[in-house]
Design a protein with these regions (language model features):
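Conserved catalytic neighborhood of penicillin-recognizing serine enzymes
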Residues: 1-34, 79, 91-118, 123-125
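Soluble, non-transmembrane domains of envelope/secretory-pathway proteins that act on or interact
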Residues: 3, 100-104, 143-254
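Acidic/polar loop patches that form or flank catalytic/metal-binding clefts of enzymes
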Residues: 79-83, 128-135, 200-215
Length: 254
């Protein structure tokens, strides 16, 4: 957006789609490690390259792959394979074939439930304060997701979910070309998602992902991310219990 916001937290960077935040995270963990890691989510390693551009979504994915991947954050860490056809019946109503959703116990858990919980929380911020805040019109607190826009506005994405439903919308041309000025994920793909999900969600009660054991909410200084002093402005953030911030801003200044 041609605006420099200075140092910001990962939560804020993700919500506002700040590319440099994602690039620095990827650089820290190493692109080769990330390339191996994404195969857990069902992505084809051959369609991605171990470079920093991975952080910007450079690579080839399908909407169905995205549904499976975001489902991991929705259900607490399990990889479930989506399917197109639930049931086939003949003209006499006899069932010829039926697909069934596997339970969590029947599917592999590919990430720590704490990881899934924190990612769920971060992706909620995208709707609460970030690029997908238009989705607040649905008036639910259990929605999370992420907008996506490729170079030259060729593709517009929105992947959004709650515990019951994952929906991914994509807009683009069969033969890649620009969608037009300002046709980003939040402008082109998100409205489709809202129109589709709003009536469907009326059939599902709001459910928040349960906080797993080993997650600690702490008050931190929003500027530096360290523990907050008692009387200073602060916000809550979630941490693994083995990776709690041990220092506060006052300690560092003195």
């Amino acid at each position: 957006n041609e605006k420099y916001d200075g140092a910001i937290r990962l939560r804020e960077g993700l919500a506002k789609s700040k590319n440099l935040v994602a690039i620095r995270v990827l650089k820290h963990i190493d692109p080769k490690y990330a390339l191996d890691y994404i195969t857990r989510f069902g992505f084809d390693q051959k369609k991605h390259s171990p470079y920093l551009s991975m952080a910007l979504g450079v690579g080839q994915v399908t909407a169905l792959e995205m549904v499976a991947a975001y489902g991991v954050f929705a259900n607490g860490g399990y990889l479930k394979q989506p399917y197109f056809i639930e049931k086939i019946i003949d003209v006499k109503g006899r069932k010829i074939k039926q697909n069934f959703s596997l339970t969590n116990e029947e599917t592999p858990r590919i990430i720590d439930p704490r990881n899934a919980f924190i990612m769920n929380s971060l992706l909620k911020e995208v709707i609460n304060t970030g690029t997908a805040r238009k989705a607040k019109i649905i008036k639910r607190s259990d929605l999370a997701g992420k907008t996506g826009t490729t170079n030259e506005l060729v593709d517009a994405w929105f992947a959004g979910f709650n515990q019951d439903i994952v929906t991914v919308t994509w807009m683009g041309f069969d033969q890649p070309k620009t969608l037009g000025k300002h046709e980003s994920g939040s402008r082109a793909a998100l409205p489709i998602w809202i129109d589709y999900m709003r009536p469907i969600l009326k059939n599902y009660p709001m459910r928040e992902l349960e906080t797993p054991h080993g997650i600690i909410p702490l008050k931190i200084n929003p500027i530096n991310g360290l523990l907050a002093e008692k009387n200073e402005n602060s916000i809550y953030e979630y941490f693994y219990d083995e990776f709690l911030p041990m220092e506060n801003a006052y300690f560092l200044l003195n």
